[in-house]
Each structure stands twice: as C-alpha cells, then as structure tokens.
C-alpha cells in the first residue's frame, strides 16, 4: 500500500489538530507502513500499567513520540537508526506532579538542564509565583523555552492564589474568566494550581469566595484538575469538607495518620521528603496495597538543593530505602501523576503515542540513572546534561518587574511614637506564626520612634510593595529572627506568594540600603553587614529566577551563605518544623498568607492599608499603640 509522506507537525506544544496528524502518522509507523526514526533496544523494560518487567525490549520512535513497543527484532517496519543498551532497564520519564519551578530560581530552559539528568522529563508547574508578578504573561512565559526546543515538557496550572488573599494586590489577578481562557488556550494547561485560601472556600462572607469558586467552576467546566493545599487541616470535618469542595490533592501532609485520613477520603497525596520515611513505613505496615493515589513532589526545591540531593529521583530513593518496592516508587514518579493530571496520552508510560521520554537505569534498586532520553533522543549521560539549552533573551515584561520609582530611605522604616511617650505597645509575631493571636510587648521609645529590643530577640521586619511604583512599606516588630550584628540587614524579592520585597534588619539604614540594592538588581538577595553591602544574588527574571546555569547560580548563593555566616542571627523555634538557626533563608516562606496563617504582614494596599491583618477574619490592627 502506497503512503503519501506528508510533513508531520512539530509537537513541542500540544494542540488537538497537530495531535491528530501526529497520531495518524504513528498508526502507519506502528504498522510498518512508514519508517521510524530510531529504535532503542534495552535489557528490560518496566510496564507501569501492570507493574511488570519484560526482557530484551525495543522502543521504536518517530519524531518525538513512541510508535511501537515490543520484543526486540519484532518491529515490522524500517528503522533509520538503531541504539542498543543491553545492560540497562528502561522506565518512563519521571514527572513532577506539583512543582514551583520559580523556587529553583532558574528560568525554564536552565531548570531543564538541571533536572533532566535526574530523569525529570515533564513538570506540572504550580504557577502562582510568576503569575503573581506578571499574571498576563504567565502561559507565554512557561511555554517559551519549550517553543524554542527545550526537552522539558511544562504543563502549567494557573494559580488560584493570584492574589493569595483578598488583602493583597499587584502583579496579577485571576478569576473565573481568566481561568476559562487559560483552559481553552492550551491542552497543556492541566487545571487550577493549589487552592490555598481555605477560609475563602468554606466561608461565603470571605471577600475571595466568589473569585475562587469562579476559578473552580471554570476548571470543572473544562474537565481540569483542581489541586489542593490542606496544610493544617487534620480533623475529619475539615478533611471531608476539603474533599467535598472538589479539591483533588494535598502535598502538605505531615503525619502518617493525616496521610491515611486524606487518602481514604479520596485525596491524591503528593509526598514531599520531610516526613516521607515515616509515612512510607507506616503505610507499608498498615498494609496499603494500592499506591495509585500517591506521587512524589519536590514542591519548592532550590537549584542548590537539587545539585546536592537530586530532583524527584531523590524522593523515590528515600521511599525505596523506607521499604517501598522500586517498581511502586517508579509508578509514583510516572503513571500515578500522569493519571492524576489526566496526561496519560502524552506522558507517564513507555507506550505508543507518548513522548519518547525514557530513563535508563543501571541499578533499579538504587535508582541509578545511566542515561535519560527526552523527545526520543538522548539528553544526558550520567549526571551530565548533553541536550540543548535555548538561548533566550527574556524581554522587559519578565526582567523589569521591581517597579519602585524612588529611593528607599531609613526613615521609611521608622515607627513613630505618640508625642511624649517613653514606651509603646507593639504587636509582635514570629516567623511561621500560626497562632490565632499576636503577642503584645511594651517597647522603648527613643528620638520619637519605637525601638527594637535585642534582649527580647525583637527586631524589625518590613514588606515593600514592588508593583505600584510608590514603594509603599508595611513594617512591624518580629521576634526570633533577623540580625543582632549592628547595622545589618537582609532583603529578598522572593516573598511567597505575592512576592513583594521583604527585609529584616538591626537598623533602618541597613534595611534601606539592602532594599535599594534589590531595586537596582531587579530582584534577588541583598545582604548588608555592618553598613556595607557584602553580598548580592541576582534574580533578574520576575525577581524570582535567574537566566543561567544551576552551577553559576549556586556559586553566587554559596558566597551569600558564606557572608551570612559572619552575622550573628537571632533565632527562636516556631510552629513550623523547617525553621532553622543561622542565615534566615526560609523567611521567603514566612510571608505566606494561606492556611494556617492568621495574623500576617502584607504590603499596604486599598484592601489592607495598615498592612497588618488577620487573613482568616479580615480584622486589621495597628502595629503600635
């Protein structure tokens, strides 16, 4: 039978019309009526659908897709190139079910170069970081590297937390109409990013209630997935209510019992490393047989930590060390997340029609990666990336996002006392202050301003608006963080999830100097020690990421850490287990406003002019009185 050879569409981005033509060609290639580009013959192959191994198998590839899988030598058609790897086991490319690429602090093309050698060939991008900086350009940003040829497939989920609460402003705003457009625009949009504002889900009086349910409705209408975030929700009424809302998953589980209660109410559980060993051992002892509702996630892993630990392959190794069968761990990286995100036609298994994403293991039990293939070609050898990194000059809409049209001055951080007062009462919170009430302390007044109290580990913390152009500042006193070293401050433009600038310091002058350095950098880190700017790290894309290799970024971060070790940092334990002594890097996450936070500091805006607000109730309060 004579077949007309038509040009096959480029399937870097998935569209329905192109998908039809690609699959028409794959049908004929599988039947042997059209030639295949290459075959990859392996010692054995894991079918993740049945969790079974087959010996001496061949994966036949056409374009970027798998056309045929079966016993070596039995493919009926012509193959232009043959590759034989007899000593390795083939498993599907690993998928990140829930990841904020922004937290690697690398742009997508450099993220690809970092994670692909770890087997991570596709990522569901939980996009409420960049979308809170430039919501209008969100999909364009996430598709650009792929459009330019990057092998990493990114499936964006527009953020439900844009803004995170009704009391924050700037950078982006998403509601029902925006989500409906996103879902209609691309088959690669899988749904709605983690719903974090739990009070806005259950309380009809919450000012975000209508916006959030509108986004959920738009996602349901397109048969998308609504991802959840159930931090702190451990009682059965709350878990049942969360599941009843249609929120499909949780990646915040901390205990085995919480994990079980959520699994048995139908939630898809995405395990991070923090409690993985305990949870996996407990579930095995419990006798869990069906692990299909479980996947592994790195969530907010930085480039430095990925260089040190690995990507989701590290999570899987921890699970295997805890006693999980390697084949089940691989399912938790492949078919489980693909099914959950409804992406099985494209990724998640070594089967016809899927992208040619293959991880070749030299040791299955240790999950030792020999090679990674993506889009049907080899892109890594051991830990070395050998694929393409597109050269992208990111435009101003991505690189000019710190919009502060003035110089910040020390007096901007003063908290002026009432005339004649020797002391003032102050509202005080701590990093990760999950308590429903703030502390009240009496603080001294000097030169008309309320002062820090080092003896009580009280310092000053501020949020600087970077979107309006005015550089509006909310400031208050925090406990148990920040520098004791005089004239010292650290500032950062990564402030989850609205990503204004946060700064903490032992003097107002040092705080101003650090923030002004970030304005000039267009985002990143700035450390001022004893009045001198001693270290900066550049996050020039969105104030969140940098367009360079992980190794180059890590070198700059290590220099920051080295200078940070010369500072005497205050520290007190808090509610969150991952709050550590020393350089306060995790203050990036102490600005979160989702559940279980109550009292928080946000940049001043119309919805929260004082900046200090209870996001559970909407109550505002002065920071001094």
Swiss-Prot record:
Its cofactor is Mn(2+). Belongs to the metallo-dependent hydrolases superfamily. Adenine deaminase family. GO terms for molecular function: adenine deaminase activity. SUPFAM superfamilies: Composite domain of metallo-dependent hydrolases, Metallo-dependent hydrolases. Gene3D superfamilies: Metal-dependent hydrolases, Urease, subunit C, domain 1. InterPro entries: Adenine_deam, Adenine_deam_C, Amidohydro-rel, Metal-dep_hydrolase_composite, Metal_Hydrolase. It comes from Bradyrhizobium diazoefficiens (strain JCM 10833 / BCRC 13528 / IAM 13628 / NBRC 14792 / USDA 110). Its EC number is 3.5.4.2. Pfam families: Adenine_deam_C (PF13382), Amidohydro_1 (PF01979). The gene is ade2. Keywords: Hydrolase, Manganese. GO terms for biological process: adenine catabolic process. This is Adenine deaminase 2. It is an enzyme of class 3 (hydrolase).
């Amino acid at each position: 039978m004579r077949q007309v050879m038509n040009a096959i569409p480029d399937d870097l981005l998935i569209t329905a019309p192109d998908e039809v033509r690609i699959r028409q060609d794959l049908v004929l290639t599988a039947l042997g009526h059209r030639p295949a580009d290459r075959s990859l013959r392996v010692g054995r192959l894991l079918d993740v659908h049945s969790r079974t191994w087959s010996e001496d198998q061949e994966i036949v590839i056409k374009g970027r897709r798998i056309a045929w899988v079966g016993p070596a030598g039995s493919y009926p058609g012509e193959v232009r190139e043959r590759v034989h790897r007899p000593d390795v086991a083939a498993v599907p490319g690993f998928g990140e079910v829930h990841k904020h690429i922004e937290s690697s602090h690398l742009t997508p093309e450099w993220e690809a170069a970092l994670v692909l050698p770890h087997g991570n060939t596709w990522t569901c991008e939980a996009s409420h970081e960049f979308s809170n900086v430039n919501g209008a350009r969100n999909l364009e940003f996430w598709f650009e590297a792929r459009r330019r040829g990057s092998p990493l497939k990114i499936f964006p989920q527009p953020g439900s937390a844009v803004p995170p609460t009704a009391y924050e402003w700037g950078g982006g705003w998403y509601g029902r109409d925006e989500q409906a457009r996103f879902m209609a625009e691309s088959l690669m949009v899988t749904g709605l990013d983690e719903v974090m504002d739990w009070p806005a889900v259950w309380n009809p009086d919450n000012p975000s209630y209508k916006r959030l349910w509108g986004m959920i409705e738009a996602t349901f209408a397109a048969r998308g997935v609504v991802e959840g975030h159930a931090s702190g929700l451990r009682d059965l009424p709350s878990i049942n209510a969360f599941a009843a809302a249609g929120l499909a998953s949780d990646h915040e589980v901390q205990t085995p019992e919480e994990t079980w209660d959520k699994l048995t109410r139908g939630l898809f559980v995405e395990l991070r490393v923090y409690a993985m060993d305990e949870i996996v051992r407990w579930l095995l002892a419990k006798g869990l047989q069906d692990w299909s509702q479980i996947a592994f996630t790195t969530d907010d892993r930085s480039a430095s930590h990925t260089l040190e630990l690995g990507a989701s392959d590290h999570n899987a190794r921890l699970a295997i060390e805890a006693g999980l069968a390697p084949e089940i761990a691989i399912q938790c990286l492949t078919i489980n997340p693909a099914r959950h995100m409804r992406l099985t036609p494209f990724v998640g298994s070594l089967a016809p029609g899927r992208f040619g994403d293959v991880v070749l293991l030299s040791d299955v039990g240790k999950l030792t990666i020999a090679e990674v293939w993506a889009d049907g070609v080899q892109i890594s050898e051991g830990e070395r990336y050998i694929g393409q990194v597109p050269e992208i000059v990111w435009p101003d809409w991505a690189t000019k996002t710190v919009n502060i049209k003035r110089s910040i001055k020390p007096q901007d951080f003063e908290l002026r006392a009432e005339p004649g007062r020797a002391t003032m009462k102050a509202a005080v919170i701590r990093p990760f202050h999950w308590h429903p009430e703030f502390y009240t302390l009496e603080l001294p007044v000097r030169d008309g301003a309320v002062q820090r109290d080092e003896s009580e580990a009280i310092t000053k913390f501020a949020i600087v608006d970077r979107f309006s152009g005015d550089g509006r500042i909310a400031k208050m006193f925090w406990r148990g963080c920040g520098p004791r070293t005089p004239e010292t401050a650290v500032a950062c433009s990564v402030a989850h999830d609205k990503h204004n600038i946060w700064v903490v310091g032992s003097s107002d002058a040092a705080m101003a100097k650090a923030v002004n350095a970030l304005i000039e950098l267009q985002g990143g880190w700035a450390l001022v020690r004893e009045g001198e700017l001693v270290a900066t790290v550049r996050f020039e894309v969105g104030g969140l990421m940098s367009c360079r290799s992980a190794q180059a970024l890590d070198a700059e971060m290590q220099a920051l850490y080295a200078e940070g070790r010369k500072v005497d940092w205050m520290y007190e334990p808090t509610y969150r287990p991952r709050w550590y002594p020393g350089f306060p890097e995790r203050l990036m996450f102490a600005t979160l406003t989702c559940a279980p936070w109550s009292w928080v500091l946000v940049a001043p805006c119309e919805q929260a002019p004082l900046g200090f607000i209870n996001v559970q109730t909407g109550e505002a309060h002065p920071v001094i009185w």
